Each structure stands twice: as structure tokens, then as C-alpha cells.
Amino acid sequence: MRHGGGDNERVYVAALILLAVLLGWPIPRLLPRVTVLRAAPAAAILLWQSVSLAAIAAGLLAAPLAVLVQARASSGQHDPEPGQHLPLLVAGLAVTAFVAGRLLLKAHLVGTDLRRGRREHTELVDLIGVDDPTLGEHVKVLTHPTQTAYCVPGSRKRVVLTKGTLDALDADQVAAVLAHERAHLRQRHDLVLEFFTVLHTAVPTWIRSTAGMGEVKLLIELLADRWAATVVGRRPLATAMLALASGSHPTSALGAGDDAVVRIEQLAVGDRHRNRVIVAAVLASVAVLQLPILLMVATLVS
């Protein structure tokens, strides 16, 4: 038995557990404060995904590796005999299977609920909405005075505008709203949001980060804004957002007026700091994804 190796193994496992805790609780609460990331929303979303995946990996690996280290230490040898400490190993794998199973179950439930909600809302919109050939395909207009615009993703995708929106906006502003919503649909931002919604609902309530979830939603809107700004310009998009800021939309949809003030500020900033933010976010994403893998390998070979 190598006592030094055993001590190192415990350190690596402890570091893995600490990593899972840090990535799962304080970091999702602190990362929204790094507002400079909003200059590059795609890279920022990549960083958020990397943090989430690394937290999951660290959490799934911690239990079986901790059991393996304990089995090695109690057996008095670096590699236990096959079958020795089997109950401990089964217990460790059971914890991992429970966590993974909970994630998969939540993924199924969230996905099913979202798809059902979108399907039902699309059917309702098709029933009460009217077509306007001047607005393009998949657009429905609701005869309502409120100023609202949103999209419903899915196989039967729709962009929904109200009569109040069309009355309040000029042609360039309407084009900006349509470009924003079509960016959501074309780039499948709903799948990104679904990924984070699954993780948010899969963990216990006291771990969930409302600020983190809100920041991800904002980044998705900023991503659509960047696309729309390249199509119609920043000014029509900004003024349209102000007009729609008080509008509402279904929870299963993506709306154009959310977080209007912050989004307009980002439009004003433009591409300032964008390249540096992209480089920093990508490097941070790669680094954080490697941490649980490196700690696992270090535990196994020490």
C-alpha cells in the first residue's frame, strides 16, 4: 500500500466534491454579476453550459470515486480483489444512477410539458389569429389592443403579433420585431432554454439560482437582438423594444420585449470588448470542462 498515493486520492476526491458544490451553488449566483459577458452572448451561453456540464460530471463522479478510494484504503492494497467491497461500490454507483436518473426524468417531463404547451398554444393561435401576407410565413396576428410580440417554437412554429403592436410600430420597427423572433426560431434558442430549464428544475429548490436562470434568458434575447440588428439596424430594434417593454407572452414562448432596458444598453455598446470577451469565455469554458476529467484521472492513477 502507498500511503502517499492514498492521501492524494482523498485530496482529489475532496477537490471533485468541492468543484461540484462550487459549480452548482455559488458560481451560478455570481456569474450574472459579470455583466461584461453580455457583450458576447453566444460565448457567454457556452460558458454557462460548460459550468452546468462540469457540475453534473463532478457530481456524478464523486460518489463512485469516493467509494473506490475508501475500498483501496481499507483493503490495504492499491487495487482491491474483484468482488471485494462490492456493496460499497454498488452504493456509490446507485447514488450516481439516482442523480442521472433524476436528470433524465426531469428532461422528459420538462420537454413533454413544453411541447404540449406549445402545441396547444399554436392550435389556439391558428384558431383565433389571422394571416397577413405582408408579414411573411408563419405569422399570426391577434386582434387585441395590447402591444405584444412573441414566437412559439416547434415543428409548427409561429410568430405572433397583436393588432396593437402593428398599430404602434412603423414598418422598420415591425421588421425588427419579426427579425428578432425569427432569429429565435432559426437558431433554435428554445432548445438552449430547455437545457437550462431541465437543470434548474432537477436540483432541490434551495440550490436553484433564479438569477442564473434569468441571466440565461437575457443572453438568449441578446443573441436574437444581435441577429436582428444586422438585418434591420439597431435603432428600429431599440425603439420597438421600448414600445413592447410592457407586453406579456406565454411561458412556453420567447418574447421580444423582455429586459428592454438592459438589451437597449447592449445595443448601444455594440461590439466593444466583444472579441476579448469571446476569447476569455471560450478559454474559461474549456478549462472548467477539463477540471472534473483531470481530477478523475488523477484519482485513478495516483
Where do the protein language model's features map onto the residues?
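Select subsegments of transmembrane alpha-helices in polytopic membrane proteins
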Residues: 49-60, 279-286
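Alpha-helical transmembrane segments
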Residues: 23-31, 102-103, 291-296
